[in-house]
Amino acid sequence: MAQVINTNYLSLVTQNNLNKSQGTLGSAIERLSSGLRINSAKDDAAGQAIANRFTSNVNGLTQASRNANDGISIAQTTEGALNEINNNLQRIRELTVQAKNGTNSNSDITSIQNEVKNVLDEINRISEQTQFNGVKVLSGEKSEMVIQVGTNDNETIKFNLDKVDNDTLGVASDKLFDTKTEKKGVTAAGAGVTDAKKINAAATLDMMVSLVKEFNLDGKPVTDKFIVTKGGKDYVATKSDFELDATGTKLGLKASATTEFKVDAGKDVKTLNVKDDALATLDKAINTIDESRSKLGAIQNRFESTINNLNNTVNNLSASRSRILDADYATEVSNMSRGQILQQAGTSVLAQANQVPQTVLSLLR
């Protein structure tokens, strides 16, 4: 090797190696400080792209798991409301069984109906006011709930939010109770009439005979009765016998007293009765609630299974991403130690290399 002054080759080689060791030391320190093997695309371009996709999936699946938990929450909220409606229906059924007992007076049944009406109003209130995050779950406002449980389009779970109220359950008050209006009937007055009249073409007596069906006097039913109107007064015969021939007509009221009466139309009596199929109607409504609750229970189990699967997937993807992205501290500490040693050695050697041109000066002495 020529002895020169302007170019110190050994110093240049030493500086180059010192730069390399410094880069190695800097990279090791960066990885140790960040905990990542890939801090920029230059560290591993392909690995960085793969890790980024894994990050996207992990973040999406984590959110999907939270979505599924929200689905469980809304199903639990809905089921809780249905449970309360079921309790109300059970109370109505109990009251209906009580109302069907023959020992109840009309006022007793009216009192029972009043309580039933209040319970039915509560069912409608629950239907209208039960909500989750502003969504009314039983009013029919939103018939279908869609929960995103994946990281891609159409990865959803759907379940129905059925409208539940008195009308849809078929338990409105008029479906359980029946109001009947009973006529008080007639008010009897006057005495019996026993005479008979002859009727012919020249008669000036006006009579009207009218058949009455189901006349009830003093609580005793009679049949085949006639009203005879004469001079503005009405007479009733329980039996009658008429003869018609070519020359004239005889009207006979045989073996029966007649009675003057008037109709009292202003005093109708209303009776309240439980419908014959009221209990069957309530059983059908309770079965409807049971079916809805079973569906919500099934969807909750499905969401729990989905959450478990999502969490497992997140764990596996996170582990895969870690193997690509995260720094191995054992390796990086070793690299840092090696870099530090090379830096110290390089600095010392560079000092020695810089002294080489000094040997040329000895030739000038």
From Swiss-Prot:
- Coiled-coil ranges per the record? none
Q: Which GO terms describe its cellular component?
A: bacterial-type flagellum; extracellular region
Recorded GO MF terms:
structural molecule activity
Q: Where in the cell is it found?
A: Secreted; Bacterial flagellum
**What Pfam families is this protein classified in?**
Flagellin_C, Flagellin_N
Q: Which PANTHER family has this protein been placed in?
A: FLAGELLIN
Q: What name does UniProt use for this protein?
A: Flagellin 1
